[in-house]
From Swiss-Prot:
CC terms in the record's Gene Ontology section: COPI vesicle coat; COPI-coated vesicle; endoplasmic reticulum; Golgi apparatus; Golgi membrane
Family recorded in the similarity comment: Belongs to the adaptor complexes medium subunit family. Delta-COP subfamily.
GO biological process, one term: pigmentation
Name this protein carries in UniProt: Coatomer subunit delta
Gene coding for it: Arcn1
Lineage start: Eukaryota, Metazoa, Chordata, Craniata, Vertebrata
Membrane topology: Peripheral membrane protein
Organism listed in the record: Mus musculus (Mouse)
Sites bearing Phosphoserine, chain numbering: S223, S244, S493
Coiled coil: none
Biased composition (Basic and acidic residues): 168-177
Name of a matching Pfam family: Clat_adaptor_s
Cystine pairs: none
Assembly and oligomerization: Oligomeric complex that consists of at least the alpha, beta, beta', gamma, delta, epsilon and zeta subunits.
Keywords: Acetylation, Cytoplasm, Cytoplasmic vesicle, ER-Golgi transport, Golgi apparatus, Membrane, Phosphoprotein, Protein transport, Transport
Amino acid sequence: MVLLAAAVCTKAGKAIVSRQFVEMTRTRIEGLLAAFPKLMNTGKQHTFVETESVRYVYQPMEKLYMVLITTKNSNILEDLETLRLFSRVIPEYCRALEENEISEHCFDLIFAFDEIVALGYRENVNLAQIRTFTEMDSHEEKVFRAVRETQEREAKAEMRRKAKELQQARRDAERQGKKAPGFGGFGSSAVSGGSTAAMITETIIETDKPKVAPAPARPSGPSKALKLGAKGKEVDNFVDKLKSEGETIMSSNMGKRTSEATKVHAPPINMESVHMKIEEKITLTCGRDGGLQNMELHGMIMLRISDDKFGRIRLHVENEDKKGVQLQTHPNVDKKLFTAESLIGLKNPEKSFPVNSDVGVLKWRLQTTEESFIPLTINCWPSESGNGCDVNIEYELQEDNLELNDVVITIPLPSGVGAPVIGEIDGEYRHDSRRNTLEWCLPVIDAKNKSGSLEFSIPGQPNDFFPVQVSFISKKNYCNIQVTKVTQVDGNSPVRFSTETTFLVDKYEIL
């Protein structure tokens, strides 16, 4: 079966929405659809008509027609089955089978049509799978949002660091007896402002104050006093900004985190004419007392070719996975070639991969309850004390080859009890009083920084601190499946290519 186009048109042959699966001009498809009503014989009950070059397979839908245009040598039974699936898809997105309703949801219909047919061939999907695929979240959008949030957090942390340095300089100056004008903003007016905005307070807690050598005594002059006053006003401006955000952030050097754990953003990838995106998403659920309830990982290699001269290529895949993942190639990929030689190529070597579109050529899946497969273990130990609970949380990286970036461990807190009292911490934390959560932020977890802990105290019960949720991003994939080489079908000559790898969290919970 070779499907040329799928369209919804009026009884006069006017195209409302049309999706072509082969290269075809707009004039050509409009001409084919305009000729369609003239070919129908109202006296017969057939659901297809033929011309010298194409076959129309159609189904009436009130005042409209669902039409498939195929080659004449296609299988009519498969065509009719595909037509039924197309006809069932349209009511999923359109409340009424009318022209204006179809036009309003035309892009939704085109996306659904693309899930049914790829490269002119029917995909093995049903209606439920089409609905799932079209509603699926965008990995690229998640990565973009995560990177942007990280940059915002880093900017806020830098602002707080500068504010603390200015406050420390002010205290050192006061110890030397050089209190300058301009610091009155930290007096009663600042306190009253804080009480007015009690619902959105911002506090900077210093559990380990840096030891700053006192400045040498110098004669105090008018110019020095003016400079100190200007610095005090700058401190006031920082504190006013902090008080408007409703968060609590603290940086501590009590743990193992040092300056080498600071995240360095990788430069943008230089995309070659052949570009691969390797994406993995993990869903994991653990019990608070230990034991992996379920872990499921989905991965895919997406191929994008931007130059048609590299359309006929083969990908050399290196699979070093030892966890037992299940691999599945695209229906148009030669499965025997992949099984025998780990090469990804089309069944028909004379055909080319699509140009300027992302094509999923290989996907894999891993599902397990084996605890040794957990990439990052989280242990949360709340113990009741006289004034509430002392909570100790530990993390440990079990996969030494991974490097996890922008790790955020979110712990729920009881409502109405105020901010937690932080003891020891590796990394940074943020208290969100509006959502009643404590976020433990770690820029990097790798083999050099594979374990750490957080201790805090707060009124509450042990059950108040679950479920614990984890999120992270990694530029190394979990299953160790890579494309090592790309060659042309003719001549087996190597082709330059680029690779982009992303390992994301879909859901990561400790219940």
